[in-house]
A protein has these predicted regions:
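Active-site diphosphate/adenylate-binding microenvironment
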Residues: 12, 113-188, 193-194
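Structural motif
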Residues: 38, 150, 201-203
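Short glycine-rich anion-binding loops that position phosphate/pyrophosphate groups of nucleotides
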Residues: 6-7, 38, 44-47, 69-70, ...
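Generic structural signal for well-ordered, non-membrane alpha-helical segments
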Residues: 22-29, 33, 81-85, 89, ...
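Glycine-rich, acidic loop regions that bind phosphate or pyrophosphate groups
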Residues: 6-108, 299
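Glycine-rich phosphate/diphosphate-binding loops that line cofactor/substrate pockets in enzymes
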Residues: 33-36, 140-147, 194-199, 297-301
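Short internal beta-strands
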Residues: 1-4, 64-67, 230-234
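Thiamine diphosphate
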Residues: 18, 23-24, 57, 73-74, ...
Length: 364
């Protein structure tokens, strides 16, 4: 199985491929690693999203850290192999020639792979409702793509959607800037990928928020002749940040356009017209059938193409619940602090952290 950073280092058509592991990963992959007695950690930093804060593995599991970085090779008391990943695996292959794992272990992996296929199929299927889910769009882009094509994303909900629902057809055909979730990388990164890859199409999936952060490289790609296909998924705001707000007990605040617009305003962006003004071939769709047809036209286009579609703001592909991650929630929020200032209870010049800490103690 793979991490987010390692996605497309394996081909998804392998009978024992069980998907990505971790908090944003698939239950199928986590079911495999939870029973492993030996894990080869190849080139991974073993951070919390990958390991579920170290809750995914059996406590007695032995790790072998194969990494060019000594610090990462030694993590979690791994047996460190500080070396090039490819060369190490080639050497291990020679040493293990003729050896094979128990057939029951292979059968377990094959069964988990079938579980992954069933899950992904359930997410990408057309349910006849508009707007579509992210997963349905990912499924149609995947159907359109070939083994030579490249898919890219960065911020918002799309990393999670592609991590689970994208089944890689080619090696090194996937890029997700998830180290910092850098909003706008979807456009600039796709332009760079188009420069670097003379064969195949470059697909980039971007949310409306990231599009607004950085979009001028659409013009740059048209100007330089490096074609890319940009799918703009408009959820009418910053839906993933809003999701994080409310999932920890907070109230939705200033992330969705409907909650942020001033009185009497309807400040919506015409993404199709905006992209067209930068020279791109553009399409706006209102059904999954239209989206599929737009993908065909975008592939045939002689320059950068932008497909604009609405998307559901609250329909995300959940990562495996067995993958644990802790995000703390404030006992007293800054929203309450602001309210207390307005009521004259606190002075706006005071340090809110000190007072919030005092209030938290009072609540306890």
């Amino acid at each position: 199985m793979e991490t987010v950073a390692g996605k497309s280092s394996l081909l998804s058509d392998h009978p024992q491929y069980s998907g990505p592991l971790g908090v944003t990963g698939a239950a199928a992959a986590n079911a495999v690693v939870s029973k492993a007695d030996l894990v080869l950690a190849v080139g991974t930093r073993l951070e919390d999203f990958t390991t579920g804060s170290w809750t995914l593995f059996d406590p007695d599991t032995t790790f072998v850290g194969i990494n060019a970085a000594r610090f990462d090779a030694m993590k979690h008391q791994s047996l460190p192999v500080v070396a090039d990943a490819r060369e190490t695996l080639l050497e291990l292959g020679k040493e293990l020639e003729g050896w094979s794992v128990d057939s029951s272990w292979r059968e377990h992996a094959v069964a988990c792979r079938k579980d992954l296929e069933t899950f992904v199929s359930s997410r990408i299927v057309d349910d006849g409702v508009w707007p579509p889910s992210y997963a349905q769009l990912v499924g149609l882009v995947h159907e359109s793509a070939t083994a030579e094509d490249y898919v890219l994303t960065a911020a918002g909900g799309l990393p999670g959607e592609l991590n689970i629902n994208w089944m890689s057809k080619g090696i090194a055909s996937f890029d997700c800037e998830y180290g910092f979730s850098c909003m706008g990388y979807e456009t600039s990164g796709a332009w760079g990928a188009a420069m670097a890859r003379p064969k195949g199409e470059v697909y980039s999936l971007v949310g409306d928020g990231s599009y607004m952060m950085m979009n001028s490289d659409i013009y740059a790609s048209v100007l330089s002749g490096h074609k890319m296909i940009l799918v703009v998924c408009d959820n009418e705001g910053y839906a993933v940040i809003e999701r994080l707000q409310v999932s920890q007990g907070g109230a939705s605040y200033n992330n969705m356009l409907a909650d942020s617009a001033g009185t009497g305003t309807d400040a919506r962006v015409d993404f199709r017209a905006h992209a067209a003004a930068m020279g791109a071939e553009t399409f706006e769709v209102s059904s999954l059938d239209e989206f599929a047809k737009a993908l065909v036209k975008a592939r045939a286009a002689d320059r950068t193409a932008v497909i604009v579609t609405q998307v559901r703001a609250k329909d995300f592909t959940e990562g495996d619940r067995e993958g644990w991650a802790k995000v703390g929630a404030h006992l007293v929020t800054f929203r309450e602090w602001d309210s207390l200032i307005l009521e004259g209870v606190f002075d706006a010049t005071e340090n809110p952290g000190t007072r919030i800490g005092q209030r938290a103690i009072e609540i306890k």
